[in-house]
């Protein structure tokens, strides 16, 4: 690994049995609290991202912390993908299954112009439910998904393979665990 990746990895804490038994939560709060670590994470995400991007979509809540700075670095807009009831006006919705439950994501129907090139940025790729739901929202918006960038890929959960089978990608991860 590189110095930046080593720094990032050292600032991610494993929390066993959270939010429920059998799940190991990747706690990024030490990373976010360390300015050098946070900057390294953003730099690594930007380095793996497509340069031909109009809009970066980030998912609530931890995806926001990475997608916004990545969008600024790429000279692109940032669009939040939120839980139901958090966005005023007309939205597209997509439900999905998580590693430990189910959820729904929404995006404003006018958030992205049709034909725009979209990059999805999130903190963790686990079972791919969140990314697949967001990719579906990109399709509903009439935009073009040009890539997915995540801070951490939990390879044992097979998210990348699910995205490959669904034709979603390319997928880039800063750390693969």
Swiss-Prot record:
Domain of life: Bacteria
This protein's record includes keyword Cytoplasm: yes
GO biological process, one term: AMP salvage
GO MF terms, alphabetically ordered: adenine binding; adenine phosphoribosyltransferase activity; AMP binding
Gene3D superfamilies registered for this protein in UniProt: 3.40.50.2020
Main location: cytoplasm
UniProt EC number: 2.4.2.7
Gene Ontology CC terms, in alphabetical order: cytoplasm
Pathway membership: Purine metabolism; AMP biosynthesis via salvage pathway; AMP from adenine: step 1/1
UniProt cross-references to Pfam families, sorted A to Z: Pribosyltran
Reactions it catalyzes: AMP + diphosphate = 5-phospho-alpha-D-ribose 1-diphosphate + adenine
Subcellular location(s) of the protein: Cytoplasm
Database matches in InterPro entries: Ade_phspho_trans, PRibTrfase_dom, PRTase-like, UPRTase/APRTase
Keyword tags: Cytoplasm, Glycosyltransferase, Purine salvage, Transferase
Family according to the record: Belongs to the purine/pyrimidine phosphoribosyltransferase family.
Assembly and interaction partners: Homodimer.
Protein purpose: Catalyzes a salvage reaction resulting in the formation of AMP, that is energically less costly than de novo synthesis.
Name of the featured protein: Adenine phosphoribosyltransferase
Higher taxonomy: Bacteria, Bacillati, Actinomycetota, Actinomycetes, Propionibacteriales
Gene field: apt
